[in-house]
């Protein structure tokens, strides 16, 4: 995700903070929590580093390329302002930051909200103004008003060999279901039309709580993936499930999708298709069972959109194993796919595996993957031509707007160019007749008015 520099209306005596958020949606939610606390204490947010009293940079440390981006952002903040507090995933390895930028004021790790606030207080004491507008009940959101990320847990208890998330964020810690639902309800009442459910491992939600129930309204709701998804589906907003590890119980969510409670969309990171590669990754490794499950899912939910992510060039990946992956893309007909060339990450067990793949081979396989996936995506989208789709409008244009179908998440998936005879509104859900399809995007005309 691109860096996000926040802004709010100035207040005469309030200290001004510039805030940069890097990385994934989970990090963006962390940023929202910090910003909400800062606003509640009277701090103002500004777009420019130069006009701020302090800069906070929420970093990403998952890949070396992300670390480089984080270090660059810190350097820019130091050059333009000079007073910088660093937090986020890269903050778990402070020596790397200090080596490049020894003058940062403080470094904290992910989810260390109190430590961030303490560092801000020390550098720029708050000047609380009792006449400031109250912070909204749903908190300060960094997304457009019509959609919001809903984080249901922190950390991950899996031990994939390519990943260091458990070392950065710890094991799975789920939020009580009642807490999640109250936040979701506040968001919907504030105008949010789409809830994007996120975590490091969404389908493991509640395992650490032993699926304990907690109160919500006049009933008790279990901290269980299926129960939570069903309750969220009763709030009247689109509910989109992200980062769903392919456990067997995920099959049951198809009933909620078929009933219209949850969007027919599943973001499920398969990572590869070759059983031998998956074994080295310490991921579920039965391609035959996975294909059979996908067929069953699509039989139950014909309009299901599958998004996934894959890694090419994993240590030891042979040409035959890579060909298995390409064949899986074709046979499974994955609608949307992200692809990453394997990068050694300090602290990852995969670094010790034999037979690293040369960078040139990684690049060549990445290109072949993307060409194959583009064909699959184009074929899947072409089937939508002539159909009517519900489209949520993200941007208004002179001749209509740009939006997304139920099969498209913001920022990572495709869009729909919508032509309309009347002005559209951001957040509106329009019925659109699809008239053309490309490799990733659609276009059509709004109908019904």
From Swiss-Prot:
Ligand binding ([4Fe-4S] cluster 1): 24, 60, 89
MTTase N-terminal domain ranges (all copies): 15-125
Catalytic activity: L-aspartate(89)-[ribosomal protein uS12]-hydrogen + (sulfur carrier)-SH + AH2 + 2 S-adenosyl-L-methionine = 3-methylsulfanyl-L-aspartate(89)-[ribosomal protein uS12]-hydrogen + (sulfur carrier)-H + 5'-deoxyadenosine + L-methionine + A + S-adenosyl-L-homocysteine + 2 H(+)
Domain called Radical SAM core: residue spans: 142-379
Residues annotated for [4Fe-4S] cluster 2 binding in this entry: 156, 160, 163
Listed GO biological process terms: tRNA modification
Cofactor: [4Fe-4S] cluster
PROSITE patterns noted in UniProt: MTTASE_N, MTTASE_RADICAL, RADICAL_SAM, TRAM
SUPFAM superfamilies: Radical SAM enzymes
GO MF annotation terms: 4 iron, 4 sulfur cluster binding; aspartic acid methylthiotransferase activity; metal ion binding; protein methylthiotransferase activity
Enzyme Commission code: 2.8.4.4
Annotated ranges, domain TRAM: 382-448
Primary site of residence: cytoplasm
Subcellular location: Cytoplasm
A cellular component term, taken from the record's GO annotations: cytosol
Cofactor binding notes: Binds 2 [4Fe-4S] clusters. One cluster is coordinated with 3 cysteines and an exchangeable S-adenosyl-L-methionine.
InterPro entries for the chain: Elp3/MiaA/NifB-like_rSAM, Methylthiotransferase, Methylthiotransferase_CS, Methylthiotransferase_N, Methylthiotransferase_N_sf, NA-bd_OB-fold, Ribosomal_uS12_MeSTrfase_RimO, rSAM
Superkingdom field: Bacteria
Keyword annotations from UniProtKB, A to Z: 4Fe-4S, Cytoplasm, Iron, Iron-sulfur, Metal-binding, S-adenosyl-L-methionine, Transferase
Biological role stated in the UniProt entry: Catalyzes the methylthiolation of an aspartic acid residue of ribosomal protein uS12.
Entry's family note: Belongs to the methylthiotransferase family. RimO subfamily.
Protein name: Ribosomal protein uS12 methylthiotransferase RimO
Organism: Xanthobacter autotrophicus (strain ATCC BAA-1158 / Py2)
